[in-house]
């Protein structure tokens, strides 16, 4: 009888451990929100994730255009400051889905709003139109990154590719950004000291 009781306790502890691990995973997933809606021939994207970073740390991370960390699909990148608040990022990108490989050049202008976020506008690239914004909202325990964008795809791109990208890649990229923010929580940039 005592043996059964001990085994039950071990089983209960094991199950509780799995529940805690599952809950932690759900909490991380719950801090990332992505909503994609088709509208006006394009896609409206709303997304957000919570980070443990201060607003200053979050802004430095958001505007780190010259990061050495590899980004999926980006083959080369050139950064040019156009004004005190505007940066142009030119990239050569190669993206792969199933048997399809897409190569394109992208030029995006970013207008920075120190400590608050930035707006972005595609000048040249994969889409007919791509514009959006990032905003940083200080919260208790960190900073909320919020993203809003409108993407109007080229009509020559097969719709199933666009839908796959929108439904899978956007969520994956938000998860990577949130993970990167979590890894940087102990790094205090010089301008935040």
What are these regions (language model features)?
Residues 4-16:
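Bacterial N-terminal signal peptides that target proteins for export
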Residues 24-26:
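N-terminal signal peptide c-region/cleavage motif recognized by signal peptidases
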Residues 29-84:
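Hydrophobic ligand-binding cavity/cleft-lining segments
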Residues 38, 81, 110-112, 134-140:
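Short, low-complexity Ser/Thr-rich regulatory SLiMs
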Residues 44-46, 101-106, 128-133:
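Short, surface-exposed coil-to-beta transition loops
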Residues 50, 69, 73, 78-124, ...:
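Glycine-rich portal/gate segments that line the openings of hydrophobic small-molecule binding cavities
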Residues 55, 59-63, 76, 133, ...:
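Extracytoplasmic/secreted envelope proteins and their assembly/folding machinery
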Residues 122-172:
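Beta-strand/loop substructures that line and gate deep hydrophobic ligand-binding cavities in soluble
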């Amino acid at each position: 009888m005592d043996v059964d009781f001990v085994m039950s306790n071990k089983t209960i502890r094991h199950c509780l451990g799995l529940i805690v691990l599952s809950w932690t995973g759900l909490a991380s997933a719950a801090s990332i929100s992505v909503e994609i809606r088709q509208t006006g021939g394009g896609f409206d994207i709303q997304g957000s994730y919570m980070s443990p970073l201060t607003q200053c740390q979050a802004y430095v991370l958001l505007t780190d255009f010259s990061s050495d960390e590899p980004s999926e699909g980006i083959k080369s990148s050139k950064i040019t400051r156009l004004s005190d608040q505007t940066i142009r990022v030119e990239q050569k990108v190669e993206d792969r889905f199933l048997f399809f490989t897409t190569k394109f050049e992208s030029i995006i202008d970013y207008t920075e709003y120190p400590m608050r976020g930035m707006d972005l506008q595609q000048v040249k690239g994969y889409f007919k139109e791509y514009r959006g914004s990032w905003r940083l909202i200080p919260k208790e325990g960190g900073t909320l990154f919020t993203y809003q964008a409108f993407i109007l795809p080229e009509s020559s791109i097969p719709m199933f590719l666009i839908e796959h990208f929108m439904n899978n890649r956007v969520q994956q990229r938000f998860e990577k950004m949130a993970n990167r923010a979590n890894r940087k929580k102990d790094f205090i940039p010089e301008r935040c000291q």
